[in-house]
Amino acid sequence: MSECFQDGTATFLILGSICTRNCLYCHVAHGVPAPIDEEEAARLVFAVKSLSLKYVVITSVTRDDLPDGGSRAFARCIGTLSESLPDIKIEVLIPDFQGQVAAIEEVIAAKPAVINHNIEVAPSLYAQLRPQGNYETSLKILSRIGGTPSIISKSGFMIGFGENSADISRLLEDLAAAGCQAVTIGQYLQPTIDHWPVRKYYHPDEFTAIKKTALEMGFRHVEAGPLVRSSYHAALSGSGGA
């Protein structure tokens, strides 16, 4: 956390803290979310100003209860921040909006510097770990983002669930084919005894090898390591550095 603040970077969660999905690797609370806070964008601007931030990541829980999945809230936060603090770089980490094209277009139209949509896990594990998600839907979202030259397309996934090297290669190949420019790869850590068990702890050298492979595939920026998460060194992905 101190490393992020030192770089003037912070991540903000919008749309509440209750997720409408229940993925087996995630410790975010799930259930019935509260109504949208219409003042959230203004409060976000106040927080960013107060912290003197240079790079802001905006993410959310999944809100399948909302007709647009929360895309309007993302667009409003991006627009309000851009208008109030034009020198701030903005990255958003979005859910899948149930694949709604209009919702994805609304976020793209708001013109953040980076749009991240995490693919999360190997496709062979989706049915078990992400039963409410869809691998192909996520790839289509990333392809649409990747087709917008002014926006950096980013994704990420965790390993340690029981995938093999072929699964990891397929993930990287599919992300590259979708036009993804930046990727984060981290070790899955089991949040509680009730969550999916860790099947393998990868050695740092293995992460180094995966990063090398990803860079050779053409990704502009790759973060790979045991403790890497979506927002780690986010400002570097926004600049396109390796």
List the model feature ranges, each with a label.
Residues 19, 62-65, 97, 162, ...:
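Short, glycine/serine-rich, charged loops/turns that create anion-binding
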Residues 1-35, 55, 230-233, 237-242:
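N-terminal [4Fe-4S]-dependent radical SAM core
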Residues 11, 27-43, 50-101, 108-142, ...:
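Core AdoMet radical
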Residues 17, 66-67, 127, 180, ...:
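Alpha-helical protein-protein interaction elements
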Residues 16-18, 60, 118-121, 187-189, ...:
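Short, small-residue-rich loop/turn micro-motifs
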